[in-house]
């Protein structure tokens, strides 16, 4: 749950979490979205469950534990950017879920601290191994926060293992600066490509988006928007990316066959998802925007 303040005043509260935000956007687009997660058996957990159900997100692989659901407090500045403080109270035994039966044609998005948390690393790697071995297409969003920098030395092996499992990495310029301290996007791609990454997408706020694959770099203008809040923008970008890849029937087998012009179309759609989310306080694309996308695809 995200509790959002602006100018030191409470603005709103939103069911949140990076993968949850993406799943809600996909659910609003009538996509078969499943969330793998956990939350407490408290009132906030009940709100979360009901919200996901109402937004067509399948929670078969979510479990509630005895305790409090995690909270984040977001302070929004004058540019709509947020700084976060997290409040977590996990049980001793965590992430006791059933692993999905992945199959070719599935897309698996994972990331944030949840994907590198030492407390659930074994369960996470088991899921990633099964997904990769089953022919699913894996997308990794590091979503690495500044407050985890003190633990980077411990966490970097997990980040790089996640990169090895992934077909596509999508992250912000800020994420990669925190992780690798490199300013050259080309050098960054060389690094992650050496670990097995096939496609790297770097977003940088309102600046152009860069997409790297072997021997090719594609530049795409970011969709313009007057930001109310940037919370969930990257998550909605991921939703747009997954929506377009799913719609175009992209798989690990044909990922490298996508021409640069088609990648530009895919990234432009993803950027429009992010822009829509920046235009309001919800962490996901609006219901109206989702209907617009669905209507335009039906033509």
Predicted regions and their residues:
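Proline-centered loop/turn at the N-terminus of a beta-strand
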Residues: 32, 137, 168, 198-199
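Conserved beta-alpha-beta core of the PfkB/ribokinase-like small-molecule kinase fold
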Residues: 116-190, 208
